[in-house]
Design a protein with these regions (language model features):
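A structural signal for multi-pass alpha-helical bundles of membrane permease subunits
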Residues: 11-299
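Short, Lys/Arg-rich, polar N-terminal cytosolic tail immediately upstream
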Residues: 1-10
């Protein structure tokens, strides 16, 4: 008992004991569904053929070969990566620019800042429906185009314009996310190095490039990483605006998995493809945070 009481007096060990039950429960909640998904992904389970998942034919790692050979799935992956490669840099540049402009004091700054973050508070499904009403053939966007140019564009039925419309909606909603992160980062910057640069004769542009940007490296990388991961989950806008169409022209990873699992009931194949995406995201995130860890060790 004496040894046990002395163990409790050690702050670090006592803290571990306090969080241990919660950690065990959380691990249990996370591991069981993951293990079940992994097993189902190794089968060809289709409820119409085999109602019980444990009776489905076990096909092993060959399931990954079947999943990767799905051309519609691969096209959805490529399309999602393309959307992310376009919208994330644009959102970052716009968000950072807004944060830097709003850094100064001016009349109505708080109100303008509040208006700027409103899109992020909108439910994505509702935002998708609003953009659908805007870009539909008889919507206000085409109405304005006909008034000023005399032309009409099939925004949601043309594959290229449908993809552009979805990306515009995504940029509208997620630019405020970058804006908030970079605003907080800019406000937390120490002013001494910046003022010292001005005293030494540096121009605003030079101080911005050589002093401010290096100090913002970590917040920038965090914002880009979080937004890049989030862009892989885009579902609401393609679903609400185009239903993945025309054809499969705007179908993303999440839409493909949704249709494969809930529409065609190919649970085994859907589980395998979900695991592929999960593993790929873990690998990318692992290498993406390496510079952050290196910067932290260097401080």
């Amino acid at each position: 008992m004496a040894g046990l009481s002395s163990w409790f007096r050690i702050p670090e060990k006592f803290k571990i004991l306090l969080i241990l039950p919660v950690q065990i429960v959380m691990n249990f909640i996370a591991i069981i569904p993951f293990a079940l998904t992994w097993y189902v992904g190794m089968t060809n389970w289709v409820p119409q053929l085999t109602i019980d998942w444990w009776r489905a034919q076990f096909i092993g790692p060959i399931a990954f070969v079947y999943a990767i050979n799905d051309q519609i799935f691969l096209a959805a992956v490529a399309r999602t990566l393309f959307i992310g490669a376009v919208v994330v840099p644009i959102e970052f540049l716009l968000g950072f620019l807004l944060a830097y402009v709003f850094l100064g004091k001016f009349i109505g700054r708080k109100f303008v800042t509040l208006v700027a973050v409103v899109p992020m508070m909108v439910v994505p499904a509702a935002g998708g429906y609003v953009f659908y009403l805007m870009f539909v053939e008889s919507g206000p966007v085409n109405g304005l185009l006909q008034i000023f140019t005399g032309i009409s564009i099939s925004f949601l039925s043309n594959p290229t314009w449908a993809l552009i419309s979805i990306m515009l909606a995504d940029i509208w909603q997620w630019t405020p996310f970058i804006f908030l992160i970079m605003s907080a980062a800019l406000l937390s910057l120490p002013q001494e190095p910046i003022n010292a640069a001005y005293v030494l004769g540096a121009s605003k542009w030079y101080a911005f490039r050589r002093v401010i940007i290096p100090m913002l490296k970590r917040p920038m990388m965090i914002a880009l990483l979080l937004r890049a991961i989030e862009s892989l989950k885009i579902f609401d806008y393609p679903y609400m605006m185009t239903q993945g169409g025309p054809g499969y022209a705007t179908q993303t990873i999440t839409m493909n998995l949704y249709e494969s699992g809930f529409k065609y009931l190919k649970y085994g194949k859907t589980a395998t493809q979900s695991l592929i995406i999960f593993i790929a995201c873990i690998i990318v995130a692992w290498y993406a945070v390496k510079p952050l860890r290196a910067a932290q060790r260097g401080e």
